[in-house]
Amino acid sequence: MFSSFNVLIILRGFVRLKKWFNIDSELAFFFPKK
């Protein structure tokens, strides 16, 4: 069974991952790897 509570947790985790990926890309932009 898939409750709305599980969906909320998954959505929150997905948003958190997106934020981490955005920070990673920004860091790579400011500090390019040699």
Curated annotation (Swiss-Prot):
Q: Which UniProt keywords apply?
A: Leader peptide
What top-level branch of life does the organism fall under? Bacteria
Give any single GO term for biological process: transcriptional attenuation by ribosome
Alphabetized NCBIfam families for the sequence: tnaC_leader (TIGR02616)
This one is known as Tryptophanase operon leader peptide
Annotated source species: Proteus vulgaris
The gene for this chain is tnaL
